[in-house]
Amino acid sequence: MLICAIPLSTKPSRLHKIRTREPGGRNVLLNLTKRCRWFEFITPSTLALQPLLELLLQPAANEHRELLQLGLQEALVNAVRHGNGNDPAKLVRIRRIHSPQWLIWQVQDQGPGLQPEQRLALLPDELDAISGRGLFLMHQCFDDVRWSPRGNRVQLAKRR
């Protein structure tokens, strides 16, 4: 159950820098602040994610939709299970930012956060394991993945 979706009239106070993979490495953050649309979604910790995923993916082009859905679902499941410990009283906050050049999602939980060594996106030794591939998949689905210093917010960016 979605608690609220808020269109933000001004940009949030903190947005991590986005790395480009282009030669020359121009500053994409400058472009992001010019013509962006910002939305914030707040939801209780639940694994019933399909309605939320549909809202989050509205600005995504069809050719990227399945890949982005996989990566976002992994981020949301990690926030609910690992960050919030499946506690329905805890909330997950998602920001969706889109510009002509980028689609960006920030997923934040109320947990203690991942330590830097836990954020490595290594493929697990056991490929058929039930879990353990989420961070690896997020890095495969998005052009840029960054963490807040505390480790309880991940930013996922995909170039349009």
Walk through the language-model features, giving the residues of each.
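Glycine-rich phosphate-binding loop
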Residues: D128-F142
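Short beta-strand/loop element within the Bergerat-fold HATPase_c
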Residues: L91-Q101
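Glycine-rich/acidic phosphate-handling loop/turn and adjacent ATP-lid/helix
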Residues: Q106-I130
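Bergerat-fold GHKL ATPase/HATPase_c domain
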Residues: L2-L70
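Short C-terminal beta-strand
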Residues: N152-R160
